[in-house]
Amino acid sequence: MSGNQMAMGSEQQQTVGSRTVSVEEVPAVLQLRATQDPPRSQEAMPTRHNVRWEENVIDNENMNKKKTKICCIFHPQNEDEEECNHHSDDDGSSSSGSSSSESENEKDLDFNERRQRRLERRHRKLEKKRSYSPNAYEIQPDYSEYRRKQQEKKD
């Protein structure tokens, strides 16, 4: 093929004799459209979202408390399904009494009232002042004993 070819960005120029021809490449565009397939039958789709445990999930001490290494949060579809009576944030040392008496008193409350009390307990717990103590990554190990033993070996 006679002439020079050189690529510049998205344009290609080809020189033929004394004439230059520029060809511009148009980028390809992929357009996705939803199909008009009918929805699946009711047998294929579950009516409620339930947690299903596989056989390899461990039963925690025969208490029917399933544990996995993956943390997931279940979001109920209806407000009726949010009837949850456990409080994982409760530390049992609240100022108004024991956690069991609080839980018993909260059984008669609606969802918003229980939520409000749970938030109040969480705020009380976070407001408690703890003395600062460095974690394991912030503490510089003491190597003086190790160095002393190494020095004794050399002598």
Curated annotation (Swiss-Prot):
An MF annotation (GO) of this entry: protein phosphatase 1 binding
Residue ranges, compositional bias (Basic and acidic residues): 104-114, 144-155
Cell membrane in keyword set: no
Composition bias, Low complexity: 93-102
Motif GLC7-binding: chain residues: 51-53
Location of this chain's protein in the cell: Nucleus
Region of interest (Disordered), ranges: 1-56, 79-155
Principal subcellular localization: nucleus
Alphabetical GO biological process terms: chromosome organization; glycogen metabolic process; intracellular monoatomic ion homeostasis; mitotic spindle assembly checkpoint signaling; regulation of protein localization to nucleus
PTM-bearing positions, type N-acetylserine: 2
Modified residues (Phosphoserine): 22, 133
Family statement drawn from the similarity comment of this UniProt entry: Belongs to the YPI1 family.
Miscellaneous note of the record: Present with 1080 molecules/cell in log phase SD medium.
Official protein name in the record: Type 1 phosphatases regulator YPI1
Gene name as annotated: YPI1
